[in-house]
């Protein structure tokens, strides 16, 4: 098949005067430096620009595969919920937006969750797919998050959250906002069970997601250069009529002001998480999969 694909087909196309089929997005441009990077090199480097270290948005499926040992994990089923309960329409029907996002991402909604081993330690991981309607939090996403927390409680294992979101999904109105207290309750249930909850803040983490489960972790790790906020910089400046500091709302700024615990390069996150979780769960070095609950807080 390789001989036919690599030799015969190009010769036939050349004889017939056909142009070779070139896939789109072979080269990716760094938003920070303008550097062009071959897409395969970018994928191999975990969507981090090699020269500048700029962290591009990483697809949810790729992040889960990178996190778990050998890329092997059990994907949690997406809960079935009502579609477009408000019959919402702006410039486009909400149902059409859902259909387009599903075709683009090959996901039912923004949340992907899985159970697997991280350096031998069983964990539940929850990841936002930003390409699905800007990772917005709606009924389906909220239900998926709650189910993931319930699974972590039943398995008695830690949960790691990777938010990347523009906030609550406006097309679902108050039903979307209801997911903020629901997910907050789920976080509290995990903590009451004595299991660690670590949040890895990625670019961007904003709005209602920041106002709920994204800022309730036992430890908050942030990727370099990530925008982390509730309201955007422009909105705040227009409200207070003052210029905000340089780098305001970036992960580095939040680290300096005590809002996050550490800023870690994406390529180092799996090892960092594994080391941290083994300490937090008191997992024996010779049996990393044995999870001991944290002591209840006073």
Curated annotation (Swiss-Prot):
GO terms for biological process: fatty acid biosynthetic process; malonyl-CoA biosynthetic process. Its EC number is 2.1.3.15. It is found in: Cytoplasm. The keyword Cytoplasm applies. Pathway: Lipid metabolism; malonyl-CoA biosynthesis; malonyl-CoA from acetyl-CoA: step 1/1. InterPro entries: AcCoA_carboxyl_beta, Acetyl_CoA_COase_Trfase_b_su, ClpP/crotonase-like_dom_sf, COA_CT_N. Signal peptide: none annotated. It catalyses: N(6)-carboxybiotinyl-L-lysyl-[protein] + acetyl-CoA = N(6)-biotinyl-L-lysyl-[protein] + malonyl-CoA. Pfam families: Carboxyl_trans. One of its GO terms (cellular component) is acetate CoA-transferase complex. One of its GO terms (molecular function) is ATP binding. It is an enzyme of class 2 (transferase). Residues 26-295 form the CoA carboxyltransferase N-terminal domain. Keywords: ATP-binding, Cytoplasm, Fatty acid biosynthesis, Fatty acid metabolism, Lipid biosynthesis, Lipid metabolism, Nucleotide-binding, Transferase. The keyword Ribonucleoprotein does not apply. Component of the acetyl coenzyme A carboxylase (ACC) complex. Biotin carboxylase (BC) catalyzes the carboxylation of biotin on its carrier protein (BCCP) and then the CO(2) group is transferred by the transcarboxylase to acetyl-CoA to form malonyl-CoA. NCBIfam families: accD. Belongs to the AccD/PCCB family. Acetyl-CoA carboxylase is a heterohexamer composed of biotin carboxyl carrier protein (AccB), biotin carboxylase (AccC) and two subunits each of ACCase subunit alpha (AccA) and ACCase subunit beta (AccD). This is Acetyl-coenzyme A carboxylase carboxyl transferase subunit beta. The lineage of its organism: Bacteria, Pseudomonadati, Pseudomonadota, Alphaproteobacteria, Hyphomicrobiales. The gene is accD.
